[in-house]
Amino acid sequence: MVKCLFILYLISLCLSQDIYTEYLIIENDTIDVFSYQIPENYDNLISHPLLIAFHQWGGNQNSTYYTTFDEEANNRGWIFMSPYGGSSNNYNHQGAQEMVKNEIIWMQQNYNIDSNRIYMVGGSMGGASGMIYANNHLNPDKPMVAATASGSGILDCERRAIEMDGNNSMIEWFGGSWDEVPFEYHRNSAIYFLDSNQSMHINLPFFDDGEFEKLHAAVRLLLPIIPALSASSP
């Protein structure tokens, strides 16, 4: 029995694809690390879908290879990528999302990737990553997501923090507690349970963070009085 298992292990090693490691460098500073796999039938003359898998809280860019996502990608002729996101507890803050965006761009510059077929998947903290990235990146001139799947993903960071009586990782990366910087918790969440009408900020890619915050605050003030305004109008 042991001999058979050992043989199967050797076969799996022989059949597995090479995993490459790359570093995201901006202005001579190493910002992040990510790994990727090229399918065995890769053809640079045709475009290939890209599957991005995100690690769970406490994981890293290699954690996703303990799943079957990489194998499924290889079987389908898809390129597979797994980002670190700057830290093992990043909770998909804006900086981590920017890293992922730049890593996708690097992959597009170095491999023939179908920009209309970029998919994201993950579990727990990583399960929400694709949904959060999709919500925050709607500029058609930059990498967008065609579809995303979440396994037990953390959907509402504000609710999660409240239920945990605070979350040190979120405080670290969002810049404060849920009641101090609610905007950061909302835009780094997949949804906002309290009111689905407020679930996502309006994505205006050319506004800076300050403008985003003003817009978010204005929307939150206006939403409760819209029904009254509608009722009073002739």
Regions found by a protein language model. Name each.
Residues 2-16:
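Sec-dependent N-terminal signal peptides
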Residues 42-92:
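Short substrate-entry loop that stabilizes the transition state in hydrolases
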Residues 16-48, 125, 166, 183:
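A domain-start/cap signature at the N-terminus of enzymes
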Residues 172-180, 203-205, 210-234:
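Active-site-adjacent alpha-helix of alpha/beta-hydrolase-fold enzymes
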